[in-house]
Amino acid sequence: MKYVGSIDQGTTSTRFIIFDERQRPVSVHQVPHTQHTPHPGWLEHDPMEIFRSACKCMSVAIAKLRQKDASFRKIEAIGITNQRETTVAWDRVTKEPLCYAPVWNDLRTYDITKKVTAELGGGDSMFASKITGLPVSTYFAAFKMRWMLENVPAVADACRRGTLCFGTIDTWLMYKLSGGKAFVTDVTNASRTFLMDLRTRKWSPELCEKLKIPMETLPEIRSNSELFGYVETDECGVAAALNERTPIMGSIGDQQSALFGNMCFEKGEAKNTYGTGCFLLMNVGEEARFSKHGLLSTVGFQVGRDGPCYYALEGAIACAGATVEWMRRNMNLFSHITECEKLARSVPGTQGIVFVPAFSGLLAPYWDPSARGTIVGMTLKTTRAHVIRAALQAIALQLNDVVGSMKRDAGLNLSSLRVDGGLSKNGLLMEIQASLLGVDILVPSMHETTALGAALCAGLAAGVWTSLEEVKAVSRRENSWKTVSPSGSAMEREAMIAEWREALKRTKWAKL
């Protein structure tokens, strides 16, 4: 039996999952990491904590597999999938981070985005968007780089000395795991920086100059499935656990990894991940589609340096699982995640309330950083069950708006939607989603599709699987999908959407 490992580095934790050649997860270890919030709107991570967590997860998961399988000898290859946009700055001499890493949904760069918009000529910065496929937003890595250069003296000093390295989490992990030998990224992560030309898949000299990001601080861009380097660190006993020099042969941003792990290899196929945020991606084929309706144009995946590049349209929602966690932890509406669906099902509707969970602004397709969390329509009869149900509806309603934009941009209709992520296990949410979209929702029996995507990238490069056709054939043989079909009337659907649109108008609260 051959095994492939996947480092799944997310917003709240790091995991290492080992898959066998039948695409089944056979060993896993997970370690949470600290969420640092030094100021309102800020969220940052300790890069060294993330690196050590990854190493710990690898060592423990491998040890667990050795106990299960006495014949286990090696991991054929390792893939990495990661929270995108979160940006690390480090010194190439010391190999140590120069500050904590601003996370993808951190809002500290709002003033930087206003400054950059002015520098690019004002308006909606269409010049840059036509290169990158992205709007100017606090979301993307380039603005975090610019903020660090202007506000962190150690970063500015390293830049002057020529020792500064910038990278997203994939780059940071590969750099540290390889002992500083691999300073690389992949096309999906690079496409989320606001510095990569989407058509050429190379850094744009013009944008780097305009945003004042020195190109020498950026890593080499590669495909998602090829040799990136070898694991050479012995942090937490990783080298000893692996038993031999193990190649890193896959790297892919988390949402693209979920697209790949959900087998969306063909044009028009789409997936949604219900995680901390909510992320819908549609494969639009080998030609980039530039959105006119508030979506992101991005790289979907590229298998091999000379392989075709498949592009995607993406709609990102900031708060999905984060909304459920807010209700549990901050508001004490329930004590365990399993109670969420039960309470929401205890009422037939929301009794007229609408919840807009814009805790850190609204992303696609609205792009409104001034929006804040809003609940409208409450009365003395409103209960926690109504609020919880309204929160689930809000997640589905935001996704419905994203799908509407995607249909207009891609000129393609959804025939079904593949889903993954923790909230895909919430049956009521899946029912609401199917009814709003009017298509079947396909829920996989094997929920680790994000980690699987990176493992597939690594395994394809290592020869564990020889083609996408073989990957799909194995998946059809080994995995199954539950279908959730639409229900309810068109009148109910339209009424829900109309109330949602009215509630959105009331969310502009923050004075930025």
Swiss-Prot record:
GO biological process: glycerol catabolic process; glycerol-3-phosphate biosynthetic process; glycerol-3-phosphate metabolic process; glycolytic process; triglyceride metabolic process
Assigned keywords, A-Z: ATP-binding, Glycerol metabolism, Glycolysis, Glycosome, Kinase, Nucleotide-binding, Peroxisome, Transferase
Gene3D superfamilies, alphabetized: 3.30.420.40
Protein name: Glycerol kinase, glycosomal
Domain of life: Eukaryota
Subcellular location(s) per record: Glycosome
Catalytic activities: glycerol + ATP = sn-glycerol 3-phosphate + ADP + H(+)
Enzyme class name: transferase
Effect of residue 141 to S: Increased affinity for glycerol and glycerol 3-phosphate
InterPro entries linked to this entry: ATPase_NBD, Carb_kinase_FGGY, Carb_kinase_FGGY_CS, FGGY_C, FGGY_N, GK1-3_metazoan-type, Glycerol_kin
Residues noted as binding ATP in the record, renumbered to the chain: 15, 276, 321, 422-426
Its EC number(s): 2.7.1.30
Organism: Trypanosoma brucei brucei
GO MF annotation: an example: glycerol kinase activity
CDD domains: ASKHA_NBD_FGGY_GK1-3-like
Family listed: Belongs to the FGGY kinase family.
Biochemical pathway: Polyol metabolism; glycerol degradation via glycerol kinase pathway; sn-glycerol 3-phosphate from glycerol: step 1/1
Keyword Transferase in annotation: yes
Residues passing through the membrane, by range: none
Residues the record lists as binding substrate: 11, 84, 139, 254
PANTHER family assigned: GLYCEROL KINASE, SUGAR KINASE
